[in-house]
Amino acid sequence: MELFPIIPAGGILALLVALYMTSSVLKEDTGPKEMQTIAAAIREGAMAFLNRQYRTIAGLALIVAVLLALLTRQYHTAVAFITGAFASALSGYIGMYVAVNANLRVAAGARNSLNKALTVAFRGGAVTGLAVTALSLLGVTSLFYAFGGATNPTRAPLDIVGFGFGASFVALFAQLSGGIYTKAADVGADLVGKVEAGIPEDDPRNPAVIADLVGDNVGDCAGRGADLFESTAAENIGAMILGIALVPFFGVKGIVFPLVARAAGIIASIIGMFFVRAEENQDPMAALNRGYIVTSILAIIFLYPISRYMLSGPGVNFIYFYGAGIIGIVLSFIFVLITQYYTSYDYRPVKEIARASITGPATNIISGVAVGFESTALPVVFISLAILGAYWLGLKSGLPGGGLYGTAVATMGMLSTAAYILAMDTYGPITDNAGGIVEMSGAPEEVRRRTDRLDASGNTTKALTKGYAIGSAALATFLLFSAYIDEVKIALNIKGNFPVDIGKPEVFVGAFIAAMMVLLFSSTAIRAVGNAAQYVILEVRRQFKEIPGIMEGTAKPEYGACVDIVTRGALKEMVLPGLIVVITPIIVGLVLKAEAAAAFLMVGTITGVIVALFLNNGGGAWDNAKKYIELGNFGGKGSEAHKAGVVGDTVGDPFKDTAGPSLHVLVKLISTITLVLAGLFI
């Protein structure tokens, strides 16, 4: 157990570095009064939404915790659920607080140099990445030992599955409400402001502009933070459950290996973060990529001694497990490249949509849907190769049943860079907000150019991290499916395989319902954006009509009215899709039993991953097709192609920022629900 101290050391170091970076960001110059006033409105709106969101989620979580205690008759599960929910909410709160304070400092820093603004923005994002991964690691570790991990290590992992369920529960509602908020505000601001009134983006005359900027934080910052928090927590717990079978070969090392690997990944991310700096004329994306490459190389290096020490035994060659970990790290790189290909305007798919816009909105939509469907192929091929490759390496290791553990190590490899990836993701809304503050405050053109460059790189990082999130979700849910099968075998005292026969009517029906649920959930999430956006559109139109002088700039819009309308709409609309996901797997498991629940989990994961890829990449491609036209291609701004591009972008908004990211959470939530309630499905 000599490597055990790395676990608390990695978590505590991450929190200390996050504290240092928070202090570093808050010490920066806050700029002129005009910037401070705008930033204060964004901060007030974002924190008010977060407080109301968490109050709503807390009430729902309390009800679920009581039901869990009554159904499972185990206080461990309910305590773990509440702990996971609280830790997930806390990490989101920390990230949001720093993001809404960093945006102003980035805008002010852009008056001096690009590097100053980049450093502040990335450090603001790094706080979220470090807080999320540290709280996930420390939460799982603390519960493992609190529930008897030192004396009964083969039982404790089964008692802490509620932590993953709690994290997933909060993540689903945080991602849903945040996604509904950000896109309802965005659609409302764009359709009335840009299309009807003909004013540019982030124009202070637009009554929905503050709500739009608030939405960037609650969707991309708090939502994605909760998403990756549950990925790391659920993956750790799933791998620990698989590790129970390895105790005869590795002792307790097989169970705690995921925690040590996670801590090493956090340390690699911390080092990589300090390599992010850029010259005035350098592309900010190059600086961010440098840090990512350093993080990935260090993760590969650190994984070697950990694998050698913890996964070696009589007749077992650790090098195969090390190879499986490298597969996971390489897969994360490949996912980034695939996402970039389908969502960047440097490549064919986006240019194809932009060209189709010349003949109107209909051909834009047709082309975007085609690109979205096409974009599912390569990710599925590489996920499949990664799972098969890692499984084969696990089998070659000499460990009986080592194939599944090989896939677990691959998942650990992919998630080893999670802290850095999440820092890149939160960097996106911070730079977006900074650009809005600069635009609304009337800063000089040079400052706007700097924030535009940062914002462009931020849009790229947001798209890339969605690709990473769905790839890690796919691997994590395969791991959790294996953990569910293991738990059922333990409950039934089965020594061999537990076959899932899709030819049985009840098993087929369980699978069928899962595919339907994914599409029904997506429908309700997209409709929720439309419903909430209608309220915003009506309010913006009302203000343009009833408040004279807004368009002339002599009267100030009522920003707070739009913020309040979107907040109430998002919290109301999140309930139905959320309940669909929580209730459906429970009904399937209780009525159709464990084998049908396994089929539900398997098909729900497959359908969820593919639909999420379609929604994320299709929406991202529509967004950048519009941006490509705005650069002066196919007629530029104001042309018929541009109008068609705006329509496509508006359709893609709820795809890529609401339904798509929520599906990442859905596939993990159905896994953790079935894990927690497996005993009731027997």
Curated annotation (Swiss-Prot):
Site residues (Important for ion transport), renumbered to this chain: D220, D227, D657, K668
Topology term for the membrane: Multi-pass membrane protein
Gene Ontology, cellular component aspect: plasma membrane
Keyword tRNA-binding assigned: no
Positions with a binding annotation for substrate: K183, K656
Enzyme class (EC, first level): translocase
Keyword terms of this UniProt record: Calcium, Cell membrane, Hydrogen ion transport, Ion transport, Magnesium, Membrane, Metal-binding, Translocase, Transmembrane, Transmembrane helix, Transport
UniProt organism field: Moorella thermoacetica (strain ATCC 39073 / JCM 9320)
EC number(s) recorded for this UniProt protein: 7.1.3.1
List of residues binding Mg(2+) 1: D186, D190
Transmembrane spans: 1-21, 56-76, 78-98, 130-150, 160-180, 237-257, 258-278, 291-311, 318-338, 353-373, 375-395, 404-424, 468-488, 506-526, 574-594, 595-615, 662-682
The keyword Lipoprotein belongs to this UniProt entry's keyword annotation: no
Subunit structure: Homodimer.
Binding, Mg(2+) 2: D216, D432
Positions bound to Ca(2+): D623, D649, D653
Annotated localization: Cell membrane
Cofactor: Mg(2+)
Protein name according to UniProt: K(+)-insensitive pyrophosphate-energized proton pump 2
Alphabetized GO MF terms: diphosphate hydrolysis-driven proton transmembrane transporter activity; inorganic diphosphate phosphatase activity; magnesium ion binding
Gene giving rise to this polypeptide: hppA2
UniProt similarity note: Belongs to the H(+)-translocating pyrophosphatase (TC 3.A.10) family. K(+)-insensitive subfamily.
InterPro entries xref list: PPase-energised_H-pump (IPR004131)
Functional description taken from the UniProt entry: Proton pump that utilizes the energy of pyrophosphate hydrolysis as the driving force for proton movement across the membrane. Generates a proton motive force.
